[in-house]
Amino acid sequence: MLSVAREGLSMNEKAELRKIWMEREAGLSENYITESNAGIIRNLFSLQEFQCAETVLFFYSIWSEPDTHEMIRRALDLGKTAALPKTYPKGVMAARKIGGFDELKPSRFDIPEPDESAPAIDPDALDFIVVPSVAFDREGYRLGHGAGYYDRYLALTRAFTCGIAREKMLAPRVPRERHDIRVNCVVTENEILRWRN
């Protein structure tokens, strides 16, 4: 069973749920990953909110996550300001401007991120945030990786928030807490789901 409707799961139960979804992601075919990447990028770039955005916070995709590397390249080619998260202890992150991937350095999680010297971008200066997850549901809530970085950060900004997910990684419902913030939309390769927050 890949969705859990009840609230207030323990840390162990959430960890088990993440494991189930990550195993599902690991089993996706290369063909499907390539095709869905193209569809997700197409739908993301079709959003009026994205087209109008001047400053966009992306995340650096790893493993079988939807490909943000091509998104970042295209955004830079369009003249947008692109940013990536810089992580700090205690679940704190900041948006820092990037001009290319050669500027990045491995974080303590081994995920490339901007150097401390990269220009910081205030949360209120962001127009659009591409939000990661282990899984999104059809109500705009996410099962994150468990560190709480985005839970804290999204509470600081008024930017338009957009989750990206493969259709096969959409859950009917993920567990949620009172502090969880729903994204404004979720983009898959096949559809764009929107909510009024």
Residue ranges and their predicted role:
Residues 58-60, 131-132, 188:
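Redox-cofactor binding/interface segments in oxidoreductases and associated redox assembly factors
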Residues 119, 142-143:
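Short capping loops/turns at secondary-structure boundaries
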Residues 112, 132-134:
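A structured binding-face within diverse protein domains that lines the active/interaction site
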Residues 146:
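Short polar/charged helix/loop
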Residues 62-64, 134-138:
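Short glycine-rich anion-binding loops that position phosphate/pyrophosphate groups of nucleotides
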Residues 4-16, 23-30, 124-129, 137-141, ...:
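Surface-exposed, charge/polar-rich loops and edge strands
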Residues 8-125:
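N-terminal active-site beta-alpha-beta segment that forms phosphate/nucleotide-binding
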